Amino acid sequence: MLSKDSLQFLDDLKANNNRDWFLDNKKRYEVFKKDYQQLVGDFLDAMKPLDPSLEMLEVKNCTFRINRDIRFSKDKSPYKDHIGVWLSSGSKGMNRSGYYVHIARAGSFIAGGFYCPEAEDLKKVRKEIAYFYEDLEEILKEKNFKKEFGDFDRNEKNILKNPPRGYEKDHPAIEFLKLKSFETSQKFDIEEVTKEDFVSKMTKKLILLKPLNDFINRAVTSED
């Protein structure tokens, strides 16, 4: 869980997103940072027994800096007004499928899968789907997964209009093969993060994503 003071810090930062305010509130930030790290540690403690691939992860592998990269952005606000928790065997610097928790006043959610893979990884995932699409269908149709997440998140930006090169339009998995991103998500109210059962509640949902993550990671870690 996060304290209400931590949520208030994020709200105040959003309203005062500048370096002077941040420096004036540095002590508040340090308290917030410890709270954030504790939350990540709690997720690791809850998830590691359920997914052995996470065993070597430490808190520092799963957090994000509060500073924004504004080099190529029109929005020059220097700080993020949200936090994320990323749990993956590939850590943050490697392309793998994983579990994600996003906490923001603008919209909080949990998610899993592989977001916008690079070209070579995308080819590997599509190849895996082409050969083992029945396995993927079984994962997505599992009753608890279907109840909590339903399907991949789909929008016009992450779906090709035509079949990808090398695949026929009548391939039985063509709707999966046309995807450019393979993630699924569920929204939650940000106030839930202040409740004592937040981590345990979210862990029960996140672990439902393990078969999907395993399927994708099997593809991206293959040699061919």
Regions from the PLM with identified roles:
Residues L2-R19, Y36, F43-L44, A130, ...:
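Long, solvent-exposed, polar/charged low-complexity segments
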Residues R105-N162:
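Compact, glycine/acidic-enriched structural inserts
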Residues K26, E30-D69:
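Gly/Pro-rich turn-and-neighbor structural signature
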Residues R71-A130:
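Aromatic- and glycine-enriched beta-alpha-beta binding-site module
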Residues N25-F32, F114-Y115, V125-I129, F198:
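Short histidine-centered catalytic/ligand-binding loop motif
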Residues P52-Y79, E148-R165:
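A short, surface-exposed loop/turn module that caps and links secondary-structure elements
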